[in-house]
Amino acid sequence: MATVTAAKTDLDVAGLPEVADPSQVAPKDARQLTRLFFDQLSRLEEGTAEYSYARNTLIEMNMSLVRFAAGRFRSRGPEEMEDIVQVGMIGLIKAIDRFELTREVEFTSFAIPYIVGEIKRFFR
């Protein structure tokens, strides 16, 4: 399980926890942290270090969603799997940029269609 601590840097001002390795966060913890990071992301000004940290951490924490969605296209061949994951990451980034916490929808439910849609667009 990844280590989550209170940030001792400038990020502490934003109230964001420091996540040592976002890609190693357990899915149950990722759900709670994702909600916290989206809450802070909506309050932060785009272009600041805190905003970039929150956005990048969200991307890294939710990379497993991309691998999960890309698994549906495994039959396309192992050589294409890396390309599929890269295209899926674009979908994840679009989902993060468009997600609104006020809609009270789980982020995973919101992101999977974006990820799969981007992958399908890759094959057209």
Say what each PLM segment does:
Residues A2-R124:
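Alpha-helical promoter-recognition and RNA polymerase-docking modules of transcription initiation factors
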